[in-house]
Amino acid sequence: MTQPPGQPVFIRLGPPPDEPNQFVVEGAPRSYPPDVLARLEVDAKEIIGRYPDRRSALLPLLHLVQGEDSYLTPAGLRFCADQLGLTGAEVSAVASFYTMYRRRPTGEYLVGVCTNTLCAVMGGDAIFDRLKEHLGVGHDETTSDGVVTLQHIECNAACDYAPVVMVNWEFFDNQTPESARELVDSLRSDTPKAPTRGAPLCGFRQTSRILAGLPDQRPDEGQGGPGAPTLAGLQVARKNDMQAPPTPGADE
């Protein structure tokens, strides 16, 4: 006997209907003062000159204007469109796709707690909950002093060091709720701890300029080489004289 059809299931696609326009924040600049515009044009010229096709410079240009206001503003989006000969819709489509481009003002330090599967199981959820309680903010919110913006983030490809906390995209490995609390306290007291690896921390706006491809003035000496989990596979391969298979057609 054929069963009667069930009730239809409606699936909502896209953002919730009550979500505000992603790039319209009260007080956000819609144009740059002449001196700021001139400075950004110099930087943009250097960035665009690296690409044979101007529109290929869109991603670094978005980082450039993000470094001006700590998030993407109507002024920044318009600047990118004007520099590259794109429409506002084309720029906004790219900017809204990538989560590294911020849609609201960001603190001096963007603290991201990985809550993807492995980090969550290893303590990432507990770390995020502890920081929410300690800082008095939720996901994508900024402390009242403007120093820390907290967010949960997806995998940072550092699962062998789980749970991982990122500060302005620098790694802090093998964190605990207590060490993460000490980390954000060091940021708010202007005595930031050194990342587990990589360059010393700098502010979010300067980080955005570095991601745009502009000079990085931080010391280039590493703060610790690869850890044991990263090297384990290489050590096993060497011990067993394991070699990568030859590339097909390499001898032809």
From Swiss-Prot:
InterPro entries per UniProt: NuoE-like, NuoE_dom, NuoE_N, Thioredoxin-like_sf
Species in which this protein is naturally found: Mycobacterium tuberculosis (strain ATCC 25618 / H37Rv)
UniProt remark on cofactor binding: Binds 1 [2Fe-2S] cluster.
EC category name: translocase
Transmembrane segments: none
Disordered: region residues: 211-252
Cofactor (UniProt): [2Fe-2S] cluster
Reactions that this protein is recorded to catalyse: a quinone + NADH + 5 H(+)(in) = a quinol + NAD(+) + 4 H(+)(out)
Protein name per UniProt: NADH-quinone oxidoreductase subunit E
Pfam family, one: 2Fe-2S_thioredx
Stored CDD domains: TRX_Fd_NuoE
Gene3D superfamilies assigned: Glutaredoxin, NADH-quinone oxidoreductase subunit E
